[in-house]
């Protein structure tokens, strides 16, 4: 995944350029929008380059024809659009989509992140529908909310919307 790394302080990225590759919150601590202890600062030029270049490599060398971005909402819109542009140069039919949310608060303005509410700004990039998922089985965080598969009412409109593809 591109939204976080296993280590932060002692990661190769942080050892190479301290405090550059990871976002920090207003207290100077590493931000945790990934829910895994850190989040990459995709809006920074060298982080963006690393992500875009690796997608180009995977697509060119291994003929990968689609990419799914875990917690895409941690990434900035510009980086995601640059990924799409780079992918289009290789194969315009390449499929790119991701989860339009984060796992926590990000240390970057929400209006600049690739979250579900901002998908109109993501050109040629889809977002997974957690609304449809939650309507079918219920949200991760609340077992009492509506879910068709559990026989709990309350999400019928979300299901209808999801079934027709949000048209």
Which role does the model predict for each range below?
Residues 2:
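Active-site cores of enzymes that catalyze phosphoryl transfer or operate on phosphate-rich substrates
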Residues 63, 84-167:
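Conserved alpha/beta catalytic core and glycan-binding cleft of carbohydrate-active enzymes
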Residues 5-112:
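Active-site neighborhood of glycoside hydrolase catalytic domains
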């Amino acid at each position: 995944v591109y939204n976080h790394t296993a280590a932060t302080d002692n990661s190769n990225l942080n050892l190479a350029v301290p405090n550059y590759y990871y976002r920090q919150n207003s207290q100077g601590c590493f931000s945790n929008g990934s829910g895994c202890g850190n989040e990459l600062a995709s809006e920074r030029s060298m982080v963006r380059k690393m992500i875009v270049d690796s997608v180009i490599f995977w697509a060119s060398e291994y003929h990968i024809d689609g990419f799914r971005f875990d917690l895409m909402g941690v990434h900035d819109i510009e980086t995601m659009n640059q990924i799409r542009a780079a992918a289009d140069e290789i194969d315009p039919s390449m499929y790119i989509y991701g989860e339009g949310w984060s796992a926590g608060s990000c240390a970057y303005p929400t209006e600049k992140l690739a979250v579900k509410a901002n998908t109109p700004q993501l050109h040629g990039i889809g977002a997974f529908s957690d609304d449809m998922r939650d309507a079918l089985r219920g949200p991760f965080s609340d077992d009492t909310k509506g879910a068709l598969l559990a026989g709990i009412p309350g999400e019928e409109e979300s299901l209808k919307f999801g079934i027709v593809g949000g048209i």
